[in-house]
Amino acid sequence: MSKLSKRQEEILAYIKDEVKKKGYPPSVREIGEAVGLASSSTVHGHLARLEKKGYIRRDPTKPRAIEVLSLGFDNDTFVKKETASFIPVIGKVTAGVPITAVENVEDYLPLPDHLAAYDNTYALVIQGESMIEAGIYDGDQVIVRQQQTADNGDIIVAMTEDNEATVKRFFREKDYIRLQPENSSMEPIILENCTILGKVIGVFRTIH
């Protein structure tokens, strides 16, 4: 077994701890913050050496794709995890009054492969309470499949005529489009037209 430096031991221990606690590995930034390394290139260098020594395996095409191999675990603690895919979290969108859409990638959300089966899937953080009767609450992350069409009753992410994004239930009426909140105290948004950015296919919530 190749000997590890103290820093490599710290990094490997942190990765193992995060995988055990969360079920997925930390990002390069998180690793750097945990062990006191400000340079991401330095972290990448240590990860490359851990990989060369057989402790981890990385997929350079995917974010956070660090797999701790059996060599990196004690025999009595090694448990094979279901592989996960990481979809981008591209900002916040309101479930109340429409707000301007944010399309910068802020983070990556791990999902089991069977839930992230589409390349054009992303996540948005919900702000507001207009969808609470559909089980979508303030602070939830909705999983969105990018598409440009929707059926009546679908929950969608819509871009309004004022270039503002909102999550609502979609209804195409005879002469207008109705974006219906799932909150009986709120009124629908009535539009002549809107751009459908995607369909909500799931909700991710962290229980504190």
Curated annotation (Swiss-Prot):
Keywords assigned: Autocatalytic cleavage, DNA damage, DNA repair, DNA replication, DNA-binding, Hydrolase, Repressor, SOS response, Transcription, Transcription regulation
Annotated active site: 130 (for autocatalytic cleavage activity), 168 (for autocatalytic cleavage activity)
Gene Ontology biological process terms, A to Z: DNA repair; DNA replication; negative regulation of DNA-templated transcription; proteolysis; SOS response
Alphabetized Pfam families for the sequence: LexA_DNA_bind, Peptidase_S24
Transmembrane region(s): none
Domain of life: Bacteria
Annotated site, Cleavage, chain positions: 95-96
Gene Ontology molecular function: any one: serine-type endopeptidase activity
Portion annotated as DNA-binding: 28-48
EC identifiers of the protein: 3.4.21.88
Function text: Represses a number of genes involved in the response to DNA damage (SOS response), including recA and lexA. In the presence of single-stranded DNA, RecA interacts with LexA causing an autocatalytic cleavage which disrupts the DNA-binding part of LexA, leading to derepression of the SOS regulon and eventually DNA repair.
The protein's name: LexA repressor
Organism: Shouchella clausii (strain KSM-K16)
